[in-house]
């Protein structure tokens, strides 16, 4: 019992440390380079000065919450595409597994793969076991700065919720160009 009481504060400290590792609104976004399920390699440089980027990290392909979240991005695709924003989901799963996952959901956007976890680590979302990412979403402005960090994702409506926030975050609407 005593060791359990000692373990609880340590877990709370570990949780607060990982939350402290997340980039904050206004910080420069971490540099990233990840392969998408469409075979292309995406980097932060591809979007810098051009458009905002959404990267929605999820733990594992073919699991309940991750499936709901990816479907949300599929269903809200037209709402997101109305803005000057590129949107991706991302995980530490290998590219082939994410390709199978994307195909099973008939997704029309790329899932980014980070099998070594180096990008997830840079974003502060890599779980302690080093094998999966925590569910956290980043909206990165065209200037490369973090506009929003969401670590309380509602998987069923996540992309719709993001689409509603884009204007207030200063992401231009395509018709405004």
Residues covered by each model-derived region:
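Short loop/turn microsegments at loop-to-beta-strand junctions
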Residues: 29-30, 52, 134-136
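Structural microenvironment flanking redox-active thiols in thiol-disulfide oxidoreductases
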Residues: 62, 67-105, 117-119
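Positively charged n-region of N-terminal signal peptides that target proteins for export
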Residues: 1-5
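Short, internal strand/loop/helix patches
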Residues: 34, 88, 98-134
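Short active-site neighborhood of thiol/selenol oxidoreductases, capturing the structured segment around
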Residues: 44-67
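Thiol-/selenol-based redox modules, centered on thioredoxin-like
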Residues: 133-177
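N-terminal "domain-start" segment that seeds a small globular fold
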Residues: 18-45, 167
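Bacterial N-terminal signal peptides
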Residues: 7-15
